[in-house]
């Protein structure tokens, strides 16, 4: 009687019917008990002549090989069954957790609105923090800018040289413009970024034969792509120069410094405003001196020759 839960494997026909002298059948029974683990019991019943020992030995070797094959097969099947069982458990666990499921357009918009409502105070807090930081940095810059302005006052014609030496501005300035700029004593740029981004350019002049203004202010609204003219101080030309100013403004319709200076809404004037605000004002010293081109037939040395 086999133990309950045991697995029985029968030896193939080639082992059950051997070629012994009497032609009697040999039978092997292998019992693998599930409770005993890997214990196997093999019983062989032989009928025939007792003197044929060599054939019995051959049959024994084949039986051992068969048992090895059976055990290997059982191990492979057990591993496959365990893998399948683990996959099924994972699938059941995944199905047990309720997922969000597909969202309809209406529910997606509701969810988006809820997220946006939560995001608004975060954005407002970030704007306030950025504004406070910007104001803090402006306060730190102001004493340095004031000191720089005071030092520039001691350098005659500083701003005239800076503007005339700038690679882009130099193409927009005539000899008459340079003479007018020679009376310029200071340049200041202020930026306001509270409600709108406003760039204010202030040009300070000493007494000159062209106009009466001591300060000329030009304001521009700034966005990502451009500087847009907002306000400008009207220029009070002296009567002796007013006719010439009119002639210059209408004689040359291309963009130049005089047209920008005298006509705030002149096409392309935002280009000059951007150069003054973003480049010249931030570091004018780099344009105060310019490189002198090497003379023909001379070699350039390591030391740069500068012109003021």
From Swiss-Prot:
UniProt-recorded name of the protein: Testis-specific Y-encoded protein 2
GO cellular component assignments: chromatin; cytoplasm; nucleus
SUPFAM superfamilies reported in the protein's UniProt record: NAP-like
Keywords carried by this UniProt record: Cytoplasm, Developmental protein, Differentiation, Gonadal differentiation, Nucleus, Spermatogenesis
Family: Belongs to the nucleosome assembly protein (NAP) family.
Protein function: May be involved in sperm differentiation and proliferation.
Lineage, uppermost ranks: Eukaryota, Metazoa, Chordata, Craniata, Vertebrata
Organism: Homo sapiens (Human)
Subcellular location: Cytoplasm; Nucleus
Keyword Cytoplasm attributed: yes
Gene Ontology MF annotations: chromatin binding; histone binding
GO BP terms in the entry: cell differentiation; gonadal mesoderm development; nucleosome assembly; spermatogenesis
């Amino acid at each position: 009687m086999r133990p309950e839960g045991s697995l029985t494997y029968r030896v193939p026909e080639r082992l059950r019917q051997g070629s012994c002298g009497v032609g009697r059948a040999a039978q092997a029974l292998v019992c693998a008990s599930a409770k005993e683990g890997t214990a196997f019991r093999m019983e062989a019943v032989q009928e025939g002549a007792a003197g044929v020992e060599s054939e019995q030995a051959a049959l024994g070797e084949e039986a051992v090989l068969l048992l090895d094959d059976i055990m290997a097969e059982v191990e492979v099947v057990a591993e496959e069954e365990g893998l399948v069982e683990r996959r099924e458990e994972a699938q059941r666990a995944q199905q047990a957790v309720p997922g969000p499921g597909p969202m309809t357009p209406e529910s997606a918009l509701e969810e988006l609105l809820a997220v946006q409502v939560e995001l608004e105070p975060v954005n407002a807090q970030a704007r306030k923090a950025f504004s406070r930081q910007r104001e803090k940095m402006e306060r730190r810059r102001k004493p340095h800018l004031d000191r720089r302005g005071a030092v520039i006052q001691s350098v005659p014609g500083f701003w005239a040289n800076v503007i005339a030496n700038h690679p882009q501005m130099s193409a927009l300035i005539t000899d008459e413009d340079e003479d007018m700029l020679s009376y310029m004593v200071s340049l200041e740029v202020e930026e306001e970024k509270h409600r709108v981004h406003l760039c204010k350019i202030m040009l300070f002049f000493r007494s000159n034969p062209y106009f009466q203004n001591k300060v000329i202010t030009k304001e521009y609204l700034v966005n990502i792509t451009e500087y847009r003219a907002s306000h400008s101080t009207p220029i009070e030309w002296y009567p002796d120069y007013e006719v010439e100013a009119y002639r210059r403004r209408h004689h040359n319709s291309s963009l130049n410094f005089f047209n920008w200076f005298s006509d705030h809404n002149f096409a392309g004037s935002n280009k000059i405003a951007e150069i003054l605000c973003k480049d010249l004002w931030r570091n004018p010293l780099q344009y105060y001196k310019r490189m002198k081109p090497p003379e023909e037939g001379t070699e350039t040395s390591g030391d740069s020759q500068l012109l003021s």
